[in-house]
A protein has these predicted regions:
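Conserved GNAT acetyl-CoA-binding A-motif
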Residues: 141, 148-161
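Conserved catalytic-core motifs of GNAT/GCN5-like acyltransferases
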Residues: 108-111, 157-159, 163, 169, ...
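A conserved beta-turn-beta hairpin within the catalytic core of GNAT-like acetyltransferases
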Residues: 99, 110-122, 132, 179
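Glycine-rich phosphate/pyrophosphate-binding loop shared by adenosine-nucleotide-utilizing enzymes
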Residues: 42, 97-103, 120
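Conserved acetyl-CoA-binding loop-helix of GNAT-fold acetyltransferases
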Residues: 124-127, 133-146, 170
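A short helix-loop-beta-strand connector motif used in the catalytic cores of GNAT acetyltransferases and
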Residues: 79-91, 121
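Conserved beta-strand in the GNAT
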Residues: 91, 99-108, 126
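Short amphipathic alpha-helix that is part of the acyltransferase structural core
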Residues: 20-76, 194-202, 206-216, 222
C-alpha cells in the first residue's frame, strides 16, 4: 500500500463522536456505536483522500458497477465533494489490514421548504461479505442517520430492495405510501430529537401538517 505523509478527511471526524446511539430505535446486541464499533481494530470515520488504496472502490463494486476509476479521477471527485460540503461518505476500516470494509453515503439536499431546511439521502450502503454478522450494516446506517439529524435534516430518505425493507424498518424507517420501495425517517422540526415513525397511514388533505403532534406522520404532499 502507498505510504502517505498527509491525509485529508471528507468532513470533520469529530462530529461522529457527538452522535448519541441510545436515541436510535435500532437494537444492538451487544451495544456498539461509531465511537465503539465492537472491535478495537474497527474504526468508523469519514472517507479519506487516501482510501483509494484501502479498497474503497473495490468495496463499492460489491454493491454496483464502479468501472475502472483511476486515482486521478478518485481524487478529483473527492475534492469536488469536499468543496461542496454536502457529501458525508462514511466508512468502516479494518485497521489491521488497512482495508475499508463498510460504507454509506449521506447526501444533503438544500430546500426552500421547511424554512429553507435540508433533507438527507442515504445511498451506497455496503458491508464486505466476509464481515457480515457483526452488526456493521446496522452500525453504518444508524451512524449516517444520526449524522443527518445532527446536521439539521428534517428527514432522511432512501430506496431499497424488497428484501431489505424489514431491516430498515428496525432502524426507524417507514415505507412511503404509493412510492415503490422508497423509505423515510423524519426528525423533529427543529432537528433536536430522533423519532421513530410509528404509523404507516398517510395524512390526507391538501396541505402538510407540520405541527409537532403530527410531524412524524408522512403526507404524500410533503417532500
Amino acid at each position: 500500500m502507498v505510504q502517505y505523509t498527509q491525509e485529508t478527511y471528507l468532513y470533520d471526524p469529530s462530529v461522529l463522536l457527538k452522535l448519541d446511539f441510545h436515541r436510535s430505535p435500532a437494537k444492538f446486541q451487544p451495544f456498539i456505536s461509531a465511537a465503539n464499533p465492537g472491535e478495537t481494530w474497527l474504526q468508523v470515520r469519514p472517507l479519506k483522500d487516501t482510501d483509494y488504496d484501502r479498497g474503497f472502490l473495490q468495496l463499492l463494486s460489491q454493491l454496483t458497477h464502479v468501472g475502472n476509476v483511476t486515482r486521478t479521477q478518485f481524487l478529483t471527485r473527492f475534492s469536488q465533494m469536499k468543496a461542496s460540503g454536502d457529501y458525508y461518505v462514511t466508512v468502516i476500516e479494518d485497521t489491521r489490514k488497512g482495508e475499508i470494509i463498510g460504507a454509506a453515503s449521506l447526501i444533503i439536499e438544500r430546500k426552500f421548504i421547511h424554512n429553507c431546511s435540508v433533507r438527507g439521502r442515504l445511498e451506497d450502503v455496503v458491508v464486505n461479505d466476509t464481515y457480515r454478522g457483526k452488526q456493521l450494516g446496522k452500525l453504518i446506517v444508524v451512524t449516517v442517520s444520526l449524522l443527518a439529524e445532527q446536521l439539521g435534516c428534517y428527514k432522511m430518505s432512501l430506496d431499497c430492495k424488497d428484501k431489505l425493507i424489514k431491516f430498515y424498518e428496525t432502524l426507524g424507517y417507514v415505507l412511503v405510501p404509493g412510492n415503490s420501495n422508497s423509505m423515510t425517517i423524519r426528525y423533529d422540526e427543529d432537528a433536536s430529537a430522533l423519532k421513530r415513525n410509528t404509523t404507516s397511514t398517510a395524512v390526507t388533505g391538501d396541505a402538510c401538517q407540520t405541527n409537532s403532534q403530527f410531524y412524524n406522520f408522512f403526507s404524500p404532499f410533503c417532500y
